Amino acid sequence: MDYKARDILSVLKNVNLSVDAKVTHLLGLKSDIKQKNVPEKAVPVIFECLRHAIASPFHALYSAGFSTLGHFLKRLYIQEHHQLVAAMSDRILPTLVDRMGDNKDRIRQQTTHALADLWEGAGPQIENLVLSVGFQGKNPFQKQTCLNLLSIAFTRSEITAAYAEATAKEYLPQIISFVEDADPTVRQGARALLVQMFIGERDSSKHELKRALEQYKVRPSHAREILAGIGLDPELYDESHSSRQHSIQQRAPSRAATASRAPSRAGISRAPSRAAISRAASRADISRAPSRADTFDERSGSTTTHVDSSSAADDGAPVLHHPKPVRTSPVTGGMIAASDNRIAVTDSIPANDFDSPKQKNTLRTNASKASGMVNAPAGHAAAPSALGHAVEKAKRAVEPLDIEPYDLSSSQELDRLQATMAPWFEGRETEMNFQRREEYTILIRRITHGNAPQRWPTAYLGFVKMTLPFVFITANSVRTSLQTAGLRAVQSLARVNKERLDSSIHIVLQNVLKLCANAKGITSQNSNLTIVAILENVTCNQRVLNQITGAAKDKNQNMRIFSAGWLEIIIDGQNRHKTHAEGVNSIAACIQEGVEDAKEDIRRAYRHTFFRFSSVWPARAKKILDAVSPKTQKLIEKDMLKMSEDPFVSNSGSSATGLFSSTPARAAAKGVTTEKGKASIAVPKAMSSPKLASRSTQPVTTKTNTLQKKPTSTLSSAPMRPGAAKPRPATAAGFQLKKKENESPRKKQTPSRVPEPGLDTPITRRRQNSDPTQNESPTKSGWVAHAADDHHIGPLTIPKRRSTRDTETPRAKASKQADIEVEMDDKNYDGRADEIVQEKVNETVYETVDEMVDERANERVDEYFDEHVDERIDEMVREKVDEKVDEEVDEKVDEKVDEKVDEKVDEKADEKVDEKVDEKVNEKVDSAADDNLQEEVAEKRSMSLSDEIIASAQRPSDEVKERSSEAERASMGKGGSPRPEREYVDSTIVSESPLPKRAVSLWSQNSINAHGILLKGIERIQTRTMATDGYRKLQGLIQHHPDLFADEEQFAVLLIGLLDELAEQTPPSKSVLSLGTVSDHKTQVLFTVKYMFENFKKFFAPHYPGTVVALLEAEKSAEMGGHLIKAIENFIDDIVNASRAHYEIIGAVVTHLGPAVQNEAGPTEHRMLRKGLDVITHGLTSMKEREWELPPDQLERLGEFVRQVMTLPSVALKRRIFALCIALRELVDNEERFWELVGSKTKGVDGLLFYYRTRQEAQAA
């Protein structure tokens, strides 16, 4: 079978044979595998045959390859050759990885079953190579294949199922993230796999999955489906996201209640009566077990707010105020629910009283609060999308804790604990006290969530004031674990104590704000979460606002980004507390600076804050828009249009969605307006002017009120007409569409087109946020703004784009629109109905006008394209075609001429050499009498020109030969048998793109011609005259010809030349770099070495140490870019992994790095030292795993090198030095011998080594 497999391999490689012939041979091999045992010698060859067959683009051949692979693996498992499968799997896994992402379903299914069959013998290899690519890549087909692979592996043998279960648990976060993937098949596959994984697990594991779904913010519908599939009650997920009592007692009002119905006088917020206050106080004083209503009251809100309109500013601008906090019901132990040894505190969230938009910025937390105010004014009622907000409310309603609350038996325990903690927080942080500090900080948090705040509130508050400095000492630690513990303790203090922490709020904010400016990402993020928790729970006064606005103007970028989210919390939480103007002025100034910040991330964050600000104070928002640059205005309008399309960002607490609103909803289907409906649209001019409407102080009629109260559901199932296609932007090349007169913005419409409110006026439903017409161009209508409060109500239109025939400036148009603002008395709430009727009428008219504008615009665009654009496109295409043809013809002609000239020269040279050889041979034959001499003459007759040149090629020096012989001896195992060479898998398969398949010309496919090109290439590389394209041609030859090199010496000559060129500091000549840079040139040199490494591993093995040293030297080049340095480092890692003689690489690297350490290395040497230390550490670790030992002389040299690098001051090098010491200590496995090598046992070195070793053992455990 061995010889037959070799014949089949040659058949598969032969490009001249038909596909049917190859399939026939492969099926014959499959038949033999099914009937006979496979010898071990034939296994590598058969794997190579199957790799060629599976990689084929022909259906018959790759199908036969997959089928043969399945039977081949079954035969090897029957013969118990599992280790052989694991060793040979690297030959075929890269090909299967490529097939995982194929566009054809059949190929992906066959690949999945092949990998499942292979998993029993090569589970770790599949996990490292296949799943890491599929789960971390962006190809949805690869993700889907990996999920299917795990699902199939669960149903296979016990070995495969065990591997699959362990791998799936390791990749559980990625699988959960796939539940929210953009591809629907990936989402479905992830949900099915999670159900399959946990359906038979213990309840504790299922509850861990539930918490993971909550942590990764999986949408409730998907989470309920998964939990129902594994046997958990889906209502558990609902209860953790939103209280059932809250959903019963706090019903979200309909859209009619929020937008159509005028607020009644009874619904207006009024100051509570004395009797109500006394009753509330008396009931709060009664000590009793909390009821369900108490739980709901705490979650829905604990303060009573009101609007003080008497002290408003003269310009109608509302201002900021926070009422005096009132006592809240205590948090009791009955409200703490324990589930699966994890505690969830359902009452540790602040009293929330406003809606929350969906946050778009991932740098900011969801800092808004949920709507829970029962007696709030109608203008601030809950949004109709309350069902969509339920997910965000639930995230704040329950805080999953990883600690257990600590219950006390008496208040004296608090004093004893404080006295016990105090000594450990004195002085500086050391190795002796940092663990105690972390433990006591966690204990403070546990006490906060225990029974102390409820049973002994006075003693507990005293304890908090005494231990608050301890918490901040921990939060300001340099250790990340201590910082996290301190900041989470502050979050718990804020959530549990709420207004009781007001007296210390300025100290808390001052300390946490400093941490927000920390350069460490995890510290700044945790500090941001802490400030969010503080602002959501503690009273916001003028001093707090000053600290937040000061952070918004800080020079630190993190502070400015986070401040945008903090201002949103303040805006949402305090938008009804307006008694003085300083707060709003400060916020407006911060937003104006933020939207024009130099950093794009900050501008984007503040544009979202501007959207929230405009929904509360539209007049101030308009002033900000007028003050910023036109470019900033466009970006704000663009972002606000996207937010208005998002159903979770809509602010429907008033009759408008903010400063701008997109085009009103249209009819369900085009052309449904009947003649009767058209007749009802006719309106007299007297009711069309906004000014006239604003002057009307008479209450609206009963008929109009009836129209207002009609519900306008957003969940209608009526068919919706799809939105019009987006027009080409006016900035497109060759496109200048002129607007018609009748296509001007809506604010230019004549008053006669405004409909009259009456009985026959059809009331169109409000457009749903998911309506496709939301995506239409904003040039058809302005964004209409309506005030979100009762102080400043009136339409405000700002045009987005100026018409080509409009000569007015945007500022002039904005000023005109400011003139038509409706002024309304704050106390005359009946006038509100006029505006609602006007809005309803406008919606009815606008939908008809929009349909007409769409039709006219489409007709005009078609006409313009027919007249101008098609002709211009033809002209441009013609020019580009001519230019491209000229370039291609010149290039191809030059290439063909060069090939013909080389071919003719070689033919003539061969003829002359053959003649000369015949003459010399005849002379030798005449004088020869020995048979051996005649045989030698016959060999010389068969020599060609290429053979003579190869024989006369430059040979490597004696040093090269000596290194090669030493490497061969090193590659032998302990028993004298050669170690198997690892099949090379280039690192670009995982992190970058694979090596490209180079095209080879038909003339170069001849082996004799290829040898000639190789010799010319070696000569040009040695003289540094090889162009960049020449390296690409050389790569193609190396890839195409498996017998390109005559012997190992010729391979060594080319490799040494390439490495010298790569490490050369001086750039090549301008003729070589005529079409590229030095980085491009060296990239091709590196790729040539990688092609040699991949295709000639047997020749390359003796040169591993020298190649690593040369690559380290090449890293010092200042001309290299970051991508090239990364490629070099990946290549070094692959060489070290492939080597079986690590001690040679370690010795070569130590010898090379010695001078750099002694000469006080600079930045480029530091880069080389960092990678060199990593290589030594990697080699020592590999030797420890294989139970190999370093020779004594190399141990001494390595110890001397460690003593030298210990003195280097670089922090990055220090970490690598101690990692090297830890690896050396584990390899030596003798404490005294180790300290003899690295030097005397000093206190500092010993402590640091102990620290790093302890951390490493903890991570491994």
Swiss-Prot record:
Residues 245-293 have a biased composition (Low complexity). The keyword Cell cycle applies. One of its GO terms (molecular function) is microtubule binding. It comes from the Eukaryota. One of its GO terms (cellular component) is spindle microtubule. The keyword Cytoplasm applies. It is found in: Cytoplasm, Cytoskeleton; Nucleus; Cytoplasm, Cytoskeleton, Spindle. Its main location: cytoplasm. HEAT repeats lie at residues 92-130. Pfam families: CLASP_N. One of its GO terms (biological process) is astral microtubule depolymerization. Residues 238-333, 671-833, 883-984 are annotated as: Disordered. Keywords: Cell cycle, Cell division, Cytoplasm, Cytoskeleton, Microtubule, Mitosis, Nucleus, Repeat. Residues 804-833, 893-927, 956-971 have a biased composition (Basic and acidic residues). Residues 301-312, 694-717, 770-780 have a biased composition (Polar residues). Belongs to the CLASP family. Microtubule binding protein that promotes the stabilization of dynamic microtubules. Required for mitotic spindle formation. Interacts with microtubules. This is Protein stu1. It comes from Emericella nidulans (strain FGSC A4 / ATCC 38163 / CBS 112.46 / NRRL 194 / M139).
